[in-house]
Amino acid sequence: PAMWSSAEFWMQRLKKDTRVKDGTWVCPNEWSPEHGPTEDGVAHAQQLVRANLQICRDAINELSAAELGLTPADVEQLDNYLDHIDTGLHTEAYDGTTWKQQADQRNIKKGDLLLREWKYSDFTRGQGPNHRHMSHLMCLFPLNQVRPGDGGYYDAAVRSLRFRGDVATGWSMGWKANLWARAKDGDHARVILNNALRHSTTYGVDEGQGGIYYNLYDSHAPFQIDGNFGMCSGIAQMLLQSQDNIIEILPALPSVWKNGHVTGLKAVGNFTVDITWVNGKPTATRIVSHKGAPLVVKSDKDLTTVYVHVGQKNLEVVPTATQGAYELKDVPAGATVEIEFTKPAGLGALKAAAPAASKAVYDLSGRRVSESAHGLQIVGGHKVLR
């Protein structure tokens, strides 16, 4: 009810674009907190309202309109707004002159595309290249509206993040750590983490002295719990992401975190994930499926070549259309999946050959071989390593 009431409010409040006249629904008289002019169609509002409408549609797909007490007319209205709402995703080219010193330092060149913060006003209406608010990047985090290969919006969002710099305090540090993790730049996310762990030198209201106090409370200043929660989330995002219903292992691992182990990370689909890594590469991953949802795992290693199992049972691993992502088939609720990156596929189920075995021995092509031959063979219908 709360989700639908929110959607109804916005479907009544949205208006047709009267400036560009592109047929889209825009949020009227909005602001990009806490930054710049007030106007229709601001990216921050558009991205949030679009997400609200989409979440309602997802709930209908999952539970059915009838179960939610909605009529076919309600669903038709929602679909119409979803089809025509301004996405809040527009780009503009850097002009090569505004805030040029910071642009040069941050590798922003003339003609580079930035994500627009305002639909009608350009980036120069902002309050400078170091403003700590990143309101037009809701699409990157916490939402999931841009991704690599989407026609340039993801790259423009990451470039806008880089152009804004690392100056931040409190919750803004937490947000930037998450944004850089979503940008798959673990080293930059760690820079923000280091800044957040710098000791604050004031207990008054001085936003230029952000960091932490001796009790590890976040200093905005003063204390602000959002910074603590945000940095914890950012660390989790460096180690695991699942926003596309794909569990991605170590997506933004800082290069200096060479060896490590983490337990209890949660992933979309009600999974709990433990990861061990050595020299920046995963060596073992343990995934508990609490719901029995489809399980897709992304890794920089071909999962069809490593040992993936539930107990002693090998799992079928099938490549998906997403590069580097593999579906692990038929994982029931309550099962614990083990991925052992240092073992070849199937080895865990092999049986030791009996010393006096006299059964016929075959290679994996079905050709009979000598009983004294070595390697992976078939003996008595079982795979055997001799």
Report each predicted region and the residues it spans.
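Flexible loop/turn segments at secondary-structure boundaries
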Residues: 17-20, 33-36, 179, 185-186, ...
